[in-house]
Amino acid sequence: MKGSLFSTEIAEPYAQALMSLAQSRDITRSIGEDCRSILDILEESAELREFISSPIIKDEDKRGVLNRLLGNDIHHYLRNFLMLLVDKRRIVFLQAICEQYLALLRKLTNTVLAEVTASTELSEGQRRDVIDKIKALTGAESVELKTDIDPDLIGGVIIKVGSQVFDASLRGQLRRISISLTGAS
């Protein structure tokens, strides 16, 4: 269900409700960090995703696992929210809700999400340079980087911000040269 329109339609009101709660308590960033942690855990564990999505597993078992897994590591408002999702049988949409919450948080804080694909891991200096360029291009106050490694790029980076793609990879440059040469002959 990841990324489906149906999932987004259900997740959005829950994410907005969580954002309203977080704003009223001035804990938007804290909840955002907790949502990132939850997304990381879900990304790492297919078993957990299957467990919380299973209609066969009892709600009390889901609550128990979530409490043991997340314990006091997340804000108690978010923990209560997760228990509500279990009770309402909406925990299956947890990933979409967290992603939607983070999108709302980025909008609130004038932050853009940039997906950067590079041939190798970026150094701290390269990360700063990419962030500075993205800020200049978008006018955003801050940038959240999501990095991916693709050795096939040979060198350089591909940066995706929203629907815009900036291809500064060696593979992209070679492709553009090839197109211009075949078009010129």
From Swiss-Prot:
GO terms for molecular function: proton-transporting ATP synthase activity, rotational mechanism. It is found in: Cellular thylakoid membrane. Signal peptide: none annotated. Gene3D superfamilies: N-terminal domain of the delta subunit of the F1F0-ATP synthase. PROSITE patterns: ATPASE_DELTA. The keyword Phosphoprotein does not apply. It is a peripheral membrane protein. Keywords: ATP synthesis, CF(1), Hydrogen ion transport, Ion transport, Membrane, Thylakoid, Transport. One of its GO terms (cellular component) is proton-transporting ATP synthase complex. SUPFAM superfamilies: N-terminal domain of the delta subunit of the F1F0-ATP synthase. The keyword Repressor does not apply. F(1)F(0) ATP synthase produces ATP from ADP in the presence of a proton or sodium gradient. F-type ATPases consist of two structural domains, F(1) containing the extramembraneous catalytic core and F(0) containing the membrane proton channel, linked together by a central stalk and a peripheral stalk. During catalysis, ATP synthesis in the catalytic domain of F(1) is coupled via a rotary mechanism of the central stalk subunits to proton translocation. F-type ATPases have 2 components, F(1) - the catalytic core - and F(0) - the membrane proton channel. F(1) has five subunits: alpha(3), beta(3), gamma(1), delta(1), epsilon(1). CF(0) has four main subunits: a(1), b(1), b'(1) and c(10-14). The alpha and beta chains form an alternating ring which encloses part of the gamma chain. F(1) is attached to F(0) by a central stalk formed by the gamma and epsilon chains, while a peripheral stalk is formed by the delta, b and b' chains. PANTHER family: ATP SYNTHASE DELTA CHAIN (PTHR11910). Belongs to the ATPase delta chain family. This is ATP synthase subunit delta. It comes from Crocosphaera subtropica (strain ATCC 51142 / BH68). The gene is atpH.
